[in-house]
């Protein structure tokens, strides 16, 4: 499962995305230090309202004079990943007197996966029965209710697997580098290129293995087979 694309709702994917946002920033002429990134992420995980500029300024202990590198939306407004699924889950669990910090990274990753790959209550309950993480009926009902009212947050898959993100995250804390730079330096991108560089044709099975929608997968396979036929 760690080799598959991760659920965007997994804890690891949320931390990875926020770290990538932070590493893209240059503030007052410098990059964020490791300890600053850790404190910022802790604040994002525990705040009820999140103002990223304010959190960053408070952690840096500086007034922000220059701020570059943030992603922007169509209205030119800065946007950041804010661990939205984690925070909604934290608040929902708190209502039934459960502390989200009782769950490990692996627990939260598995919960995120189950709530993403399944869409109906029966399937989710069955998945929880077979999961490594053991939950009470009250917690299961809480999580399923959260998923029902926030379906869009549990409908996406990340570009990377849990395995790759877990390898990158320690480096992303230590170095002010974004994901693609680190992937190239660590040889992950090169490894993917080497994997197929001797292929004369598109390896259909390998190329579509991360596509989960069966209709889309079939369309992609047909397209690749046509391209391969044209290259013969």
Task: Indicate residue ranges for each PLM-predicted region.
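Long, compositionally biased intrinsically disordered regions
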Residues: 1-232
């Amino acid at each position: 499962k760690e080799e598959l694309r991760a659920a965007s709702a997994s804890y690891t994917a949320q931390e990875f995305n926020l770290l990538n946002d932070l590493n893209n920033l240059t503030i007052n002429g410098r990059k964020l230090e490791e300890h600053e990134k850790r404190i910022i992420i802790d604040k994002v995980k525990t705040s009820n309202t999140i103002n990223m500029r304010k959190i960053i300024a408070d952690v840096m202990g500086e007034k922000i004079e220059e701020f570059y590198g943030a992603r922007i939306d169509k209205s030119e407004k800065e946007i950041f990943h804010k661990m939205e699924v984690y925070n909604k889950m934290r608040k929902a669990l708190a209502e039934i007197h459960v502390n989200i910090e009782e769950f490990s990274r692996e627990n939260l990753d598995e919960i995120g996966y189950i709530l993403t790959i399944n869409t109906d209550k029966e399937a989710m309950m069955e998945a929880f029965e077979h999961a490594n993480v053991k939950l009470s009926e009250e917690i299961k009902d809480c999580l399923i209710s959260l998923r029902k009212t926030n379906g869009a947050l549990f409908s996406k898959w990340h570009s990377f697997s849990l395995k790759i993100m877990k390898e990158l995250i320690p480096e992303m804390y230590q170095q002010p580098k974004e994901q693609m730079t680190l992937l190239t330096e660590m040889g992950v991108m090169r490894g993917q290129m080497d994997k197929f560089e001797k292929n004369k044709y598109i390896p259909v099975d390998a190329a579509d293995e991360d596509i989960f929608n069966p209709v889309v997968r079939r369309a992609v396979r047909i397209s690749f087979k046509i391209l391969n036929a044209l290259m013969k």
